[in-house]
């Protein structure tokens, strides 16, 4: 708690420090008397201040001591609370561990009880099994006696167990042979089924191949007919080509003769090759166009020229 020193002194000395108006009877006091009076008042005030200061110091020390005691008590209280909280937590942890251990012990006890019941039931079953085996042993004792009599009559075996082992060996061999025979029969059946399946597939393939052969033969006949048609057409084309070649030769020969006749009569000088039929035809066409134009001009002028004879070709 914070202590206000100013408020404390103000409250303590408010009455003593107030300036009092002098009474009228003081008007007759001498200055020396007044000075002594003021000094006396100052001494009283200083004594009062000293007393109040000592009281304040004592109260302040008491308050500090009280504060220290309160802080110490607070620390002790905090420590006690911490220890109490720790105690509660440890106690709760111990309680949880105890509960967990009790639960585990209950589970273990239940498990042991179930195990005991199971062992008891198993023991009961074993006792029943033992009784059954004893009954079977008593029932099969006649076979033991029979085997003992057989052993006495043979010199091959010395004990009954040897005879039983020999019998078990023969039975195992028989079982192996029977198993092998069964496997061979199954293998033979599978091979027979595979053979039948293969024969069926082969017959189907042969039938399919025969159908394909028939189709291919028909296709071959059609191809041969088409080939014969194309051969006939090719012969016709060759004959037509020969005729066209012969006709083309005649045309080229006639063109050359006509070109040479025109060139000779019109005295044309050209460097056209005898093989260039197209150039010859172009030259002949130009000459015919020129002659036609000249003829038209002469006809307009009233003079009809004598048309030169143009050689004809077959």
UniProtKB/Swiss-Prot annotation:
Record flagged with keyword Coiled coil: yes
Top-rank taxon: Eukaryota
Coiled coil: 34-133, 175-231
Tagged with keyword tRNA-binding: no
Gene Ontology CC terms: cytoskeleton
Keywords, alphabetical: Coiled coil
Family the entry assigns: Belongs to the CFAP73 family.
PANTHER family noted in UniProt: COILED-COIL DOMAIN-CONTAINING PROTEIN 42 LIKE-2 (PTHR21683:SF15), COILED-COIL DOMAIN-CONTAINING PROTEIN 42 LIKE-2-LIKE-RELATED (PTHR21683)
Name of the protein in question: Coiled-coil domain-containing protein 42 like-2
Organism from which the protein derives: Xenopus tropicalis
